[in-house]
């Protein structure tokens, strides 16, 4: 029942986006005949709309564009489609599959005169009379309807020329009859100016903010188009919208699109531009902007970067800012009821804006334009790639799923990076010096999935630009042993990201934190790196001591900032290395920077509790001094899973040696199992060191051999023909034996005993090893026994503890 209610509310909140079905709304289809002023409908649809063959119709497309055409019937056209060629589609700013509306336009007059101009790059090098060759045959006996602002293409004399209708009399549309005067004198129109108007932003150029767009539409379009609605209900239409969100999510873009689509007068104020050095001038600039807008109502005033001109008045020391804020307040209250002026503002720091501006009646609607989710990212990618040539193997959905935390701007950068990579591959065929590029090369360009993969490896979400994170290329294979721990970690991070529905089903929020502890050199940091790489989440690594700075209160601010960034780029793994440096037990250290360390811990504790459950942020801590860590941070709900990472046992040691020597050539007689048996009590780092040293010895021998051979060659040139094989093809047994002479244990038995004791006490104080429910019947107790026993063994490797002493 509840879910039904929610979905109903969703429908209402986006109700304004739904297309109403009317008989005159048709879907654009490719035309068969190439005539620029003909659209064709099915006969049934023409009867329904009461149109006749040869009638003039008015077509309305996107971005308030309209044009006039002649309608003909076409039997092959289905009822809900309309056929038009590319020229008409461009004039309406629509693509195939978009929806346009069509209505009869009976009162089109014959034109007295029209003025058309060619577009410069299509008439280069044409000699002769444009009018005679192109325009006269095009308009002769055709009675074409045209509209001011249309562009049409005329073929003739071996090439095609594009013309733009600059003026018609009577305006805005007329039919070109035999006695209409056609002017085509004047400077040709530059293609750039045309392209700019073509590239205006519309609603369909914005992806990933469907709900917010609906809110904005009902705030802007309803009052501007149908003010009577609000009068009938008896409320004042809302007047201010504040868009806020992280940079790059499309706040300014939305405002532009609204301006283009509503056709209202649009007045852009860039925040800092208003400021002036003369006293009183800044305020008068603001007043002028509002007066201008009221004259041209309905109008939209858009203030970009609002936090520059309306900061909190208590915080600013400048007199000017205060006066500007006051002026803005009075102006927004003084907008007359009748004047349909809407004020929109954008900022990415909504909390630094004066609170008086955020009350109802000024900026009464605050629309949070957040970081898009996977479906939103897919929409954005489709918009950015709709003009790109994509190869067949490109799977945009997968790209959308992998780009966690990317905003629209990052995705745009990603697409252009992929396209550049595609061009680089063809670089050997392109010569920069040439005037033109081969058509073959141009046509063979296409962006493949590999290009996207490459771009993905290059791109970081902009929320994480400062804490730039190299995602390490370490996989689970690089880590020998520790299988239980690996599984725990995968469950911790991957389940909430990949199966959120399961958590909903069982009604629990996933746990958010893990603490690794154990002797140094056992792979705690390595595990965190591997998890960052394996589960497509973003990864922020925080080295403990970095957080502390000399300024009072700055260390805590650093903590806050890091958690904010992680929330913005969710799903995200926060890895605190050397946690003991920032989370010491409180109260012991007196006089350390005025107790700065204590305050940092308090900040971390509050942040960990305040992780809103919606965001997937995981915290992993690693330390080798678990005894001095503040107990408050170890409670369930913060770092709730304490995982002891012991020294590797024999099985794990074999796995570690194999993982280390995966890429090395080793001779057959090296018995790694025996090596593992002998190196009891060695940590993972010690084993790695043995492998490195053996490798180094082999390299040394190889180099010495080469030098010796070079000498022999110089003394005895006749022996050169004999091609000898590589003297040291692989790491031999004696290299390992030599390396073992230098091997040492980095962790003494004493240390290990400490860790063991700690793990033991934790387990006793925390867990009930022998807990059973009282059995009502024998069948019920069986499975629960087994599972609880297994669980205990998993977390603290009880079975492996004995091997540590050997």
Swiss-Prot record:
Residue numbers binding ATP 1 = 247-253, 348, 384
InterPro entries listed in its UniProt record: AAA+_ATPase, AAA_ATPase_CDC48, AAA_ATPase_domain, AAA_lid_3, Asp_de-COase-like_dom_sf, ATPase_AAA_core, ATPase_AAA_CS, Cdc48_dom2
Q: Where is this region: Disordered?
A: 708-727, 768-806
Compartment(s):
Cytoplasm, Cytosol; Endoplasmic reticulum; Nucleus
Q: Name one GO biological process term.
A: regulation of autophagy
Write down the chemical reaction(s) this protein catalyses: ATP + H2O = ADP + phosphate + H(+)
Residues annotated as binding ATP 2: 521-526
Q: Which family does it belong to?
A: Belongs to the AAA ATPase family.
Assembly behavior: Homohexamer.
Q: What is this protein called?
A: Transitional endoplasmic reticulum ATPase
